[in-house]
């Protein structure tokens, strides 16, 4: 509320006070004359002393009209001084603006989500949205109340529809469907993850993570349906955060390789993922396994990450989930250990510093795999894999306010022995943009081209049986992901696939143009 000392109301109050004072003076008259004189003399002395102490005050006093009382004179001088100070400040600001100087910095406000951000899941290579970018944020104070006792959480649901738009596409019964989109395909993936802060007990960055995942598919080979855990983990750091340790039931697809385009799972439900990593035994959300991950940071950018995990089933993802839908079993049939090692260089975008992530990894698996050239012979346990990937920001569209916005490019190369793996090579080139338009600063656009190369041994074996075969499957996809509001993403994608089936095909299913629509909502 602003109070105007020169308002009519204030003037009325002073009039009443003056009338009351005048009546009192008429009654008491000369009795108080001596006091009035002494009071006026005292006020005059104060004014002279102040004038001598300050040349500026003297000049101001010399320009101020004489008042009837000492108190009124002091009030007038204070108001005049404030007015001059304010005028000087405005003049200085105006001069600064004319020469292009920036205004004085404003003290930053306390971010209400800063404390909540400390409870986000640690040790991941992908960027799950923070509490501020969720649908419920901190409504009702529920997140803040849980944070007081060290608990954080995130939940999300991804719902996707895929359908081949080509007019001559060969449809089939659901039971005989051979690829996602051959018939209209729908699937839903739902997650709930809770963290507990152990740093309150003196454990550096200590955290316990517990998560569950539920999925349903109209095309079961894409899944299958399941309800179970996706994470039960313990995390902490050592040596002033130079060393990270994470152990438990993990999903390494979020911790190694960086297969999600742009690093945001909410924006990448269509991003092509190679089977090389999964057929090599890497665990992921629907198929977590016991894992120990140790990361050493040589400096702020260079790192090495070592992972020892129980391999998923060597017979494939479908076989693993069918045998262990809850994810709690220690192992599945014929599964052994998978050793992964990744070295990388990574720096995040900053004003004038472009985002860069280079990584390369190798894996060795002693699970018992079927020999593709001789399936009837005893299984062997000498499988391996490798990958090399890079992502680089080419241009920053908003350097100072949001350095991560701009245009990016990247590539991935992966491989595995053709005698034990149906996919022996995988190549990917990607171009994507974050916040390309000022009116849509959180949207993402991606264009991705891939080539999946099948094992020569597997292709030759299928051709020997009289099947039509293809030695690779090429695809190109474009996706636009709109950030519609806190925690709400919607994606539209179009993917052309040359030979969408695995190795064998018929002339009617040699090509596909899959339309995809998806929503991702984070809570």
Regions picked out by a protein language model, each given a short descriptive name:
Residues 2-5, 15-16, 34, 46, ...:
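N-terminal periplasmic/intermembrane-space "pro-region" immediately following the signal or transit peptide
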Residues 155, 191-196, 232-236, 292-296, ...:
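Residues on the lipid-exposed face of transmembrane beta-strands in outer-membrane beta-barrel proteins
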Residues 159-163, 212-216, 249-253, 308-312, ...:
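Transmembrane beta-strands of outer-membrane beta-barrel pores
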Residues 130, 136-153, 165-166, 195-207, ...:
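Short loop/turn motifs that connect adjacent beta-strands in outer-membrane beta-barrel proteins
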Residues 509-523:
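Outer-membrane beta-barrel "beta-signal"
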Residues 348-439:
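Long, well-ordered mid-to-C-terminal structural blocks that present hydrophobic/aromatic surfaces
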Residues 183-314, 421-461:
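Outer membrane beta-barrel
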Residues 151-157, 206-210, 243-247, 300, ...:
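Transmembrane beta-strands of outer-membrane beta-barrel proteins
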